[in-house]
Design a protein with these regions (language model features):
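Acidic active-site catalytic centers that drive phospho-/nucleotidyl reactions
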Residues: 6, 47, 103, 122
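Short acidic, glycine/proline-enriched helix-loop-strand junctions
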Residues: 68-80, 94-96, 126-134
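Active-site neighborhoods of divalent-metal-dependent phosphate/nucleic-acid chemistry enzymes
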Residues: 75-116
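Amphipathic alpha-helical segments within well-ordered protein domains
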Residues: 8, 46-50, 88
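Short, well-structured N-terminal submotif of metal-dependent ribonuclease cores
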Residues: 1-40, 53-67, 134
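Short glycine/serine- and small hydrophobic-enriched flexible loop segments
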Residues: 50-53, 111
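Acidic, PIN/NYN-like endoribonuclease modules and their adjacent C-terminal/linker elements
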Residues: 107-108, 112-134
């Protein structure tokens, strides 16, 4: 099984003071032990690193990023121009849901890669129709 990893999950894994830190770290450890393929996007990591730099500092964020780079189970997918366009259509269509554009590009990527599950604490993934964990 492949699972998409969203910004909130990465933040909770990296920041021990995050409200979801304990549950996120345990779930992440379980995924690694189960040898699950983790998929995330370049936009998710940009968002993650920007937010983490403000909360845990740049130095710790860089260390976290370097750990991610060595994770054999992590695939960082670039958002393609088609994902961007599909994301915009989702963003436009569901303007009543308060989805972020980053969420919408994630939905587009997940549709393209046929991934139906997300490691996230963001209710928007469930609202759009994906299974969410933990």
């Amino acid at each position: 099984m492949r699972i998409f990893v969203d910004t909130g999950a990465w933040i909770a894994i990296a920041d021990r003071n995050d409200q979801y830190a304990k549950i996120a770290s345990q779930f992440y450890t379980d995924l690694i032990h189960q040898r699950r393929n983790l998929i995330t996007s370049d936009l998710i990591l940009v968002e993650t690193f920007n937010l983490l730099s403000r909360t845990i500092g740049s130095k710790t964020t860089v260390k976290f990023g370097n750990v991610l780079k060595t994770n054999a189970f992590l695939i960082i997918e670039p958002i393609t121009p088609l994902d961007w366009e599909r994301g915009w259509k989702i963003f436009d269509k569901y303007d009543d849901k308060d989805f972020s554009f980053t969420d919408c590009t994630s939905f587009a990527l997940m549709e393209r890669l046929k991934i139906n599950s997300a490691f996230t604490f963001d209710i928007h993934f469930k609202q759009y129709g994906f299974y969410v964990f933990p």
